[in-house]
Amino acid sequence: MKNKVVVLSDIHLSDNSPTSWYQKGIHQEYLLAIFEWVVSHSDEVSELVLLGDIVDFWTSPFDVVPPTFRHIVEQNELVLGPDGGLARVLDALDGAVTYVRGNHDMMVTEPDVTSISSSGDHHVKFAGDLYSPGNDPRVLLRHGNEYTMFNAPDLTTKFAPLPIGYFITRIVADYWHQHLAPGQNVSELEDQGYPNGLNWKSVVEDALRSLEISIADVLISGIAGKEDVAQTLPITLDDGSTTTLIEVRAEYRHLFTHWVEVNGGGEEGALVAVKAGLADYNSSFMGWFAQRQAFADHAQLVVMGHTHAPISGLAESLVNYVNSGFECPSVADLKTKTISFAVIAMDSLETTLFHAVKVGAEAPSIHPLVAPVASVVDVPGKDYSCYVVIDNTESSSDLTLIGHGLEHGHFINLPVSIRSGTSATLWLQDFPHVLSMHGSQGSVVYRDDRGRDYEFAFGCPKERHHIQCSGATTFRAKTGYGEWLAPNQVPSTGNPLFVMFTLTT
């Protein structure tokens, strides 16, 4: 039964120059082994989704024009050519290969993607930035850079849609261009093949502490200083024009304030902006963004790439988040990093991670991968949110939000309407401990088509106060990893709170 979707991201195919993360002499055999695994399982695989950063336009030194898509294909014929590994997958799956853009390939176009073809005259399909296999709304696939401050498309500068992360990656590439020994490439070094090309922990920490000044100033100056790269050097862009880091700093000077504004402004906007910065820094809060997206779009599973860190699930959530990992760890990092991909069973939405493993001189083989789970909070177990499902599937009336109250916390997802025959999830999250000692507590009022009002109240305290659940004719509740209690029973302790209210009018 062909019910499985394979998700592969972050290959970073480029021109195989010394500053390219992907080196075909190292990574190609692993990638081809994955493609052959897909071909050999074509009786059960319905589709291969290439989930962003498949090619890479970012890892060129300052004085080099980034490679074109055509040039990358020419440099990687055994992968992308008409008789290459991807072409074999195209023919085995009857053309069911779909390309979703990431950040390092955000300039890829539909004509670029569809130019990849097979001897069977199948072409890769282009899905833009967001994709649901088989138009199944339960599943959302996107690269994930959209949730990160330094790598999300930025439409506010003259370099749009390039984010500041593009220039950070160019800084690192220029540094290695100057410092690699003859015949050496970055895949031989530790801590390479990562979203921005280096371990920039201290620099990002400084940037995120500088909320009242330009994060771009701190970030660019800090990384350029660390890498000893002059900010006056010309940077050659893909159209042949040039810029400098001085100009880049000025263009992105409002980066943090822009993130605050587009996420609601004030304290709540600042919280989202900080999460977006931390998501780039150490992949934290990617689970938070995945859950927010799932609730907003009524999805059950979100699969992303971008972080280069495989994730097998989401702790204490009504939905699931999986990260497929990446395909270009450096040789020095292969003892701790792995070349991985995800497989979704579309009937159950169970998602399994696999990785390509090479032992000695043997060809790489494919094996299941055990990976950590993510959390929506930075300290697992410290989520004091209320997750509230209002089940309107048995009702003949639509519901419209007419009011809400907040004692503690803030709404991350608050549907303004719930159609008859559907359900919706509300998310009330507690503020971070440094801002509030309380958990979350609030209420909402919805009105149906007949003018009847329904109030739902809920609370998940941090201190020794009672958990609250009330409203509707029937509800069921639980906390944490506990079991759902009998109808209309309120948990005595635990966190976070999950409650499902059922309407039957």
Report each predicted region and the residues it spans.
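Extended recognition/assembly regions associated with phosphoester-bond processing machinery
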Residues: 1-370
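Intrinsically disordered, low-complexity segments enriched in small/polar residues
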Residues: 371-505
